[in-house]
Amino acid sequence: MEIKDKNNKTQFFVTSTRKRNYTNLIKSAQRLKNEKFNFEIIVIGRNKVFNISSVPKDIKDIFIFKGQVTYSKLYEIIENSDYIIITLTPESKYDNLFRKTRVTGSAQLSYGFLKPCIIDREFAYFYNFNDKNSLIYNDLNLYNAMKKAILLNNNEYNNLRNNILLITKKIYSISIMNIQKLIPEIKHYNFSNAPPNLLENHPLIY
């Protein structure tokens, strides 16, 4: 994958997901706009969760809500974005599952497209994110992380992306080793009893 420079107008990507709190994102965006920073936030996902009516009138112009989209459209949007904001918060019991037993799809998009994440420090370690490959914040101080993301020059930005590439290679190697360990078991699995593909004949949406 080609490592390209940042957009002149910084593009943040975020998902509209059940049980997430977007108050901190809205407050941070409002403060950044008041300080005349050049950016916009692309939102993908269920409009009933987080939509244009959730955003104060004076910052509606920087939020672009796409709703649910096909995977091909999602990948196009990610490719054109600069950063992925992961809105997990340690105060949420539901979100805490995403640093123990569950994996957020936004982290996987970061790995796949080499896009630096903006993520709370409480969750960063679980996903191998750190200050060398992403923008880490704590105490709900999302504003500082977004501001730093906007101000990064192209060399600093591309260094983050190159370091994400190191993570993806590490994860790939571990995955291959795990698959190799399972191969003997897979050989004896009866796939005729596997359930049908439930997504067959249905459009893939995110």
Q: Predicted segment positions?
A:
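Structural motif corresponding to alpha-helix initiation and N-cap regions
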Residues: 68-72, 104, 139-140
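Conserved catalytic-core segment of nucleotide-activated headgroup transferases in glycan assembly
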Residues: 1-56, 65-72
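A charged, aromatic-enriched C-terminal amphipathic alpha-helix characteristic of glycosyltransferases
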Residues: 137-147, 151-202
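A short acidic/histidine/glycine-rich donor-binding loop in glycosyltransferase catalytic cores
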Residues: 116, 125-138
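Short, aromatic/basic amphipathic alpha-helical patches
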Residues: 52-60, 128-131
